[in-house]
């Protein structure tokens, strides 16, 4: 079948309809979770259970799916589908497979950028004559090693990669009053949730294309991105985002203890935020020359005419649109579809959700879902709640909305076939021209307490589908933003708890430096998260460690998990104080400590608010002027006693706060508790 859009509705209609779609999906998800937790399951309300394995499902319908059987066998995956496990198969029928093969250009696929042709492996229109490599790729594009019912989908990426190490992006379409779930805005699910012994089968109407073009070259495919593509071509920026993977993880095997599975390749991926031509046109920009003049207005004329120089205005303009790491829409900031059913228990309603990303310009971008406003369903870049920006000319360039794929494909007929997936990342359309202006950032957008999740600052995690998803254990060399200074320490990534639902653990005799994000030059108070205990709940003696900022010692050594009720910290529950903890906050600050934020709840503590939990603190480590250039925070293990033969040396680190000094000391508007 062929899915087409109906006539494009107004934005308000689109948003309302999408909201209703998602509400139905979330209601189904809740119902499923209730059934799963019940001791007595009403079988009449379950999905039809066939008693077949996934392999049986295919063989029993071989007249429709023989091509996929052939492809799965050639990829040496078919026997896997006869085993115990959890799999999701997106299943195109024979007609869809044949059509896909016939639609491929030739043996070679080229791009508009005249890059080296890509071998497709397709030498004839017959499935049996596909190359081994192409058969393998097609089969792997359609299989995921986890069960996914459609009720678990939300706008954005499916949590786990497919067997081809690619993200599948979910969106929606309505055709003739029928609702369709789309994969990569290409394949529609036409028969969903066929449950088998070892997984779920969703029948789709097309083969999911194994896209290999880079992000930059994928942008060039869409005429409605022609101006931004011209800027990429002029600056040669495609070279900066051309990597697909770097050092093979096989070379790390001697250094890893292999407690948890590590992705066999260390991919390098990128995310691009791109304006359609219509957005440029609305700002009087119709040509590349117009865009060059616009860039020089905001970024100056240094290296004028040398467009491949990183100091050139056009180069800076392009670079600010890219961040390292593959960041799906539903993980730009945390969302229920990106994190799972515990989201509503974990985050306190009404608090804004945000994250900060270092861009390839070497500056910051802030992403935010303003849940404290009536506009909390959207994600914005460089969001401001001020009625007017710090610089009045910036009014067109702040509160830049990232447009969901479903909405974007229905905004204009030209956008109908837009696919966000590239071979090395993702593309997100935006609704305003995105620029970096330091005066606006310092005076408005990031004139605030900035809280950076240590894990989200490591793009290797999102590039390899580990971020908020998979346990992993690594040497420091896996990350370019972490340096090993000495010792034999390892780094463990732990999803599921913490400020942004994850933590990094340092263990053994660790000595690591973490690169700090590129904040504007000014004086800051710097704090880190600190896990703790109290005397009632533990008698353990903990390891100690020393912090250094740019090789300068930060105060006295710290315990791995100090006792929060010690006199030198002084934590007490707010509800036993006469003023709900106001004076206590001042006393703790004088001792160099703060309670945890009140905007999220403690996952391990039964979802008690983090501020009311003795297990979470913030340690004030320095007040320093951070100049332009790199800055590094070092964690150095000092030693641990042996308790019953076990050395205690795990240090969980969650986030770092970098706070402009005037925010800390403002007597008129004290810093909030969020």
Where are these regions (language model features)?
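Extended compositionally biased segments used for macromolecular assembly or nucleic-acid engagement
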Residues: 240-256
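Extracytoplasmic/secreted envelope proteins and their assembly/folding machinery
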Residues: 55, 65, 69-72, 94-98, ...
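Aromatic/histidine-rich interaction motifs
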Residues: 102, 107-187, 292-413
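Post-signal-peptide N-terminal segment of Sec-exported extracytoplasmic proteins
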Residues: 57-91, 95
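FKBP-type peptidyl-prolyl cis-trans isomerase
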Residues: 90-100, 195-210, 273-282, 421-436
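Bacterial Sec-dependent N-terminal signal peptides
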Residues: 27, 33-62, 78, 107, ...
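Sec-dependent bacterial lipoprotein signal peptides
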Residues: 1-35
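Extracytoplasmic
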Residues: 394-407, 433-674
């Amino acid at each position: 079948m062929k899915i087409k859009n109906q006539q494009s509705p107004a934005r308000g209609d689109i948003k309302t309809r999408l909201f209703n779609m998602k509400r139905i999906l979330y209601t189904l998800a809740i119902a499923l979770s209730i059934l799963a937790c019940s001791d007595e399951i009403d079988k009449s309300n379950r999905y039809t259970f066939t008693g077949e394995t996934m392999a049986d499902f295919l063989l029993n319908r071989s007249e429709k799916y023989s091509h996929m059987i052939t492809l799965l066998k050639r990829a040496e995956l078919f026997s896997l589908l006869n085993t115990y496990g959890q799999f999701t198969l997106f299943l195109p029928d024979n007609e869809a497979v044949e059509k896909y093969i016939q639609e491929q250009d030739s043996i070679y696929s080229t791009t508009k950028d005249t890059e080296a042709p890509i071998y497709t492996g397709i030498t004839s229109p017959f499935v049996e004559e596909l190359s081994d490599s192409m058969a393998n790729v097609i089969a792997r594009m359609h299989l995921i090693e986890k069960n996914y019912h459609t009720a678990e989908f939300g706008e954005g990426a499916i949590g786990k990669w497919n067997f081809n190490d690619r993200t599948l992006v979910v969106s929606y379409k309505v055709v003739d009053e029928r609702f369709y779930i789309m994969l990569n805005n290409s394949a529609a699910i036409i028969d969903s949730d066929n449950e088998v012994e070892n997984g779920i089968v969703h029948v789709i109407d097309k083969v999911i294309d194994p896209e290999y073009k880079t992000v930059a070259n994928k942008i060039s495919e869409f005429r409605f991105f022609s101006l931004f593509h011209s800027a990429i071509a002029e600056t040669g920026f495609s070279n900066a985002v051309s990597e697909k993977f770097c050092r093979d993880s096989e070379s790390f095997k001697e250094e890893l203890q292999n407690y948890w599975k590590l992705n066999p390749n260390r991919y390098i991926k990128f995310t691009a935020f791109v304006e359609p031509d219509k957005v440029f046109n609305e700002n009087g920009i119709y040509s590349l020359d117009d865009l060059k003049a616009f860039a020089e207005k905001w970024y100056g004329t240094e290296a004028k005419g040398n467009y491949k120089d990183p100091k050139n205005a056009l180069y800076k303009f392009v670079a600010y649109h890219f961040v390292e790491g593959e960041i799906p829409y539903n993980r730009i900031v945390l969302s229920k579809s990106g994190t799972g059913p515990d989201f509503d228990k974990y985050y306190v309603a009404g608090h804004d959700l945000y994250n900060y990303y270092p861009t390839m310009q070497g500056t910051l971008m802030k992403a935010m879902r303003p849940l404290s406003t009536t506009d909390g369903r959207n994600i914005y870049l460089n969001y401001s709640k001020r009625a007017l920006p710090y610089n009045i000319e910036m009014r067109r360039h702040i509160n830049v909305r990232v447009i969901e794929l479903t909405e974007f494909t229905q905004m204009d007929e030209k956008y109908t076939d837009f696919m966000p997936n590239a071979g090395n990342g993702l593309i997100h359309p935006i609704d305003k021209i995105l620029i970096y202006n330091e005066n606006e950032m310092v005076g408005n957008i990031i004139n605030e307490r900035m809280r950076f999740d240590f894990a989200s600052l490591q793009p290797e995690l999102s590039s390899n589908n580990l971020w908020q998803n998979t346990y992993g254990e690594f040497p420091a060399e896996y990350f370019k933003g972490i340096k090993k200074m000495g010792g034999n320490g390892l780094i463990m990534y732990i999803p599921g708890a913490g400020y942004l639902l994850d933590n990094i653990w340092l263990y053994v005799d660790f000595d690591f430096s973490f690169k700090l994000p590129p904040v504007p030059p000014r004086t800051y108070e710097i704090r880190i998260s600190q896990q703790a205990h109290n005397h009632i709940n533990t008698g353990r003696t903990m390891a100690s460690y020393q912090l250094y900022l740019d090789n300068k010692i930060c105060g006295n050594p710290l315990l791995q998990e100090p006792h929060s009720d010690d006199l030198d910290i002084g934590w007490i529950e707010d509800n036993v104080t006469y003023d709900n903890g106001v004076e206590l906050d001042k006393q703790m600050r004088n001792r160099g400590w703060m309670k945890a934020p009140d905007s999220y709840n403690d996952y391990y503590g039964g979802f008690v608010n983090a501020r009311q939990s003795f297990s979470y603190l913030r340690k004030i480590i320095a007040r320093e002027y951070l100049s332009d250039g790199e800055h590094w925070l070092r964690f150095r293990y000092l030693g641990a006693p042996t308790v019953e033969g076990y050395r205690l040396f795990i240090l969980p680190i969650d986030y770092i706060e970098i706070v402009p000094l005037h925010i800390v000391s403002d007597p008129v508007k004290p810093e909030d508790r969020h």
